[in-house]
């Protein structure tokens, strides 16, 4: 049922004739604007490889290259399914100061809020579980409900996916755009380090 839900959702996205756009929302960035290396990560919050990167590789990347001014890092949503869409909605409804902390928590506890049993209520139960994480960051039940119905945030998330496909031919997550060059799949710190040193 989950595979059918994902396939139907993706088909519906690409049935849209025009790109969505948002003037006020954007991917979240960290690092110096003057950094010689720019890394954009297209990721999915339900992707296990994205969680692995976030939990295992990103902390060292941040301490050795982002905090030292070598890398500017940007996160862009690439929703793979309806659960992903709701998770990204929650993330972008959080205060900007809480964005990276909530992002980290969702990846750390990914297996807890993706509720696969019973199989006929995956979306409903996972969406409810996400709301519990929102409360930890001051997002009330009413705020969360409003967030899920926020068209501007929905449009932004969908546009990022469509633009990622059209501009970079992205078909899987994570995908990294490093100074304009595309690298698909999860990357270890050692792999990224080699690329960064070549481009810096």
Specify the residue positions occupied by each region the protein language model found.
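Extracytoplasmic thiol/disulfide redox context detector
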Residues: 1-85, 131, 135, 154-167, ...
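Cysteine-centric redox/oxidoreductase cores and disulfide-bonded domains
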Residues: 79-172, 177-181, 186-190, 197-200
């Amino acid at each position: 049922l989950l595979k059918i839900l994902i396939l139907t959702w993706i088909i519906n996205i690409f049935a849209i004739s025009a790109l969505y756009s948002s003037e006020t929302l954007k991917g979240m960035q960290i690092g110096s604007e003057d950094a010689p290396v720019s890394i954009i990560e297209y990721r999915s919050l339900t992707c296990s490889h994205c969680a692995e990167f976030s939990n295992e590789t990103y902390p060292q990347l941040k301490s050795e290259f982002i905090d030292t001014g070598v890398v500017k890092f940007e996160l862009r949503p690439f929703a793979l399914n309806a659960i992903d869409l709701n998770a990204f909605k929650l993330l972008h409804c959080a205060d900007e100061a809480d964005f990276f902390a909530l992002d980290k928590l969702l990846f750390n506890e990914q297996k807890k809020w993706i509720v696969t049993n019973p199989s006929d209520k995956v979306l409903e139960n996972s969406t409810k579980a996400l709301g519990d994480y929102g409360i930890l960051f001051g997002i009330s039940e009413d705020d969360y409900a409003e967030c899920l119905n926020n068209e501007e945030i929905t449009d932004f998330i969908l546009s990022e996916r469509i633009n990622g496909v059209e501009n970079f031919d992205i078909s899987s997550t994570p995908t990294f755009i490093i100074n304009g060059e595309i690298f698909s799949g999860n990357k270890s710190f050692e792999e990224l380090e080699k690329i960064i040193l070549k481009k810096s």
